Amino acid sequence: MNAQPLRVGIGGPVGSGKTALTLALCLALRERYNLAVVTNDIYTREDADFLVRNEALAPERIIGVETGGCPHTAIREDASINLEAVDQLNRRFPGLDLILVESGGDNLSATFSPELSDLTIYVIDVSAGDKLPRKGGPGICKSDLLVINKIDLAPLVGASLEMMNSDTQRMRGGKPFVFSNQKTGQGLADIIAFIERQGLLTAA
């Protein structure tokens, strides 16, 4: 059991696959770790409801936060609403190992406050085009792990994974990244290995 839970922030643009990744991580890790989730949505609790419907975790382990019009503010400049949700989960489930904090759909400049997140995973998707990595921004360049999702769509949108690979290496300067397809689970094992290694997680 870890003294304080590892908090992993999962960010990225709307539709990139953040919630699908959060669901996949819950299903893969819930037997190994004492786990909970905070989701951020602008005006609803849609992502939290999705996780509950798909039985990611018991409903009481998932808190949906409504951020209002600026989802990036709730994870960066004023993270108090998220920190309160994390505190609530810690009180509800003593001995938590891991809390996933999924941001609302944000732009390429959004980052997590260090107060809120120990590790950050930023999710982009191939359907946004193969030029996306070279556009940079803190999420692409500075996140602890970049996930390039929906690689199955590359042929459909004319995106070059080779170009994305070389651009991402250049933009991230050696920081890790993973190509993934959440529909098939491709890349998930690498993402989990990163979380466990970097977060010093030890299963109960």
Curated annotation (Swiss-Prot):
It comes from Pseudomonas fluorescens (strain ATCC BAA-477 / NRRL B-23932 / Pf-5). Homodimer. UreD, UreF and UreG form a complex that acts as a GTP-hydrolysis-dependent molecular chaperone, activating the urease apoprotein by helping to assemble the nickel containing metallocenter of UreC. The UreE protein probably delivers the nickel. It is found in: Cytoplasm. GTP binds at G12, P13, V14, G15, S16, G17, K18, T19. HAMAP family: UreG. The keyword Chaperone applies. GO terms for cellular component: cytoplasm. Belongs to the SIMIBI class G3E GTPase family. UreG subfamily. Pfam families: cobW. Facilitates the functional incorporation of the urease nickel metallocenter. This process requires GTP hydrolysis, probably effectuated by UreG. GO terms for biological process: urea catabolic process. This is Urease accessory protein UreG. Keywords: Chaperone, Cytoplasm, GTP-binding, Nickel insertion, Nucleotide-binding. One of its GO terms (molecular function) is GTP binding. It comes from the Bacteria.
